[in-house]
Amino acid sequence: MKIQILGVARTGTTNLALSIEKEGYTTILEPYGVNPKKNKTALVEKICVKNISNQFPIDKFKSAYDFQLENIPTFDKTILLDRKNELEHWKSYLNLLKKYHKDPKTTHTIWYEDDITSDWDRKMRNDGFYEVFKLQKETIKKLSNEFKIPITYYEDLFSEDRMYSFETINKWDLDIDPFNVNEYLDPSKRYKQIGKRSQFI
């Protein structure tokens, strides 16, 4: 089975891809990101490709949406990921930008609410990143409508109600053990921590 995970940044795409990798899949993370990777999807039977919804081969397409119109049909299953709570999503996105600017290797580490300042929020908005964020979300919605693929939400996938999250995963009808994937996606693995960092210094 060939699976594509396509989501807005900070919707659990990486953890989901890694959980599927443990089910015997070859995993490719963001082949059209900062450092493009050669596309080997046609060479592997069990493969999971994770893409962010604004990434695409810029030498061949004008937009990520146009690219996915051709890309999605090449997979047996595409999972679309977003978040319901846009404010919390934007804060998480700000954290991603902050860590990436400081040290890209730290983007998948824990963070706290007080890590994000109003000055950083203002700077990222002024630099146009909020528009990028909104475009990612809009692309997911458009593709959901075009291909009639329901959007899976972060809040459901990492829900404290693990039976509900299991049912969410099971509905995808993938060639995986949904119990294993559900266990891997336990809410304790979320990057954002409760409380303030200053309390733990």
Q: What does each model-identified segment do?
A:
Residues 1, 68-70, 201:
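Short, Lys/Arg-enriched, disordered terminal segments
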Residues 166-201:
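C-terminal accessory extensions appended to soluble enzyme cores
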Residues 33, 155-157, 182:
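Residue-level "edge-of-site" marker
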Residues 49, 53-149, 154-175:
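PAPS-dependent sulfotransferase catalytic domain
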Residues 1-47:
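PAPS-dependent sulfotransferase catalytic core
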Residues 10, 157-159, 184-185:
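Short, surface-exposed acidic/glycine-rich loop or hinge patches that mediate macromolecular interfaces
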Residues 30, 152-154, 179:
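Residue-level detector of family-conserved "landmark" positions at structurally sensitive sites
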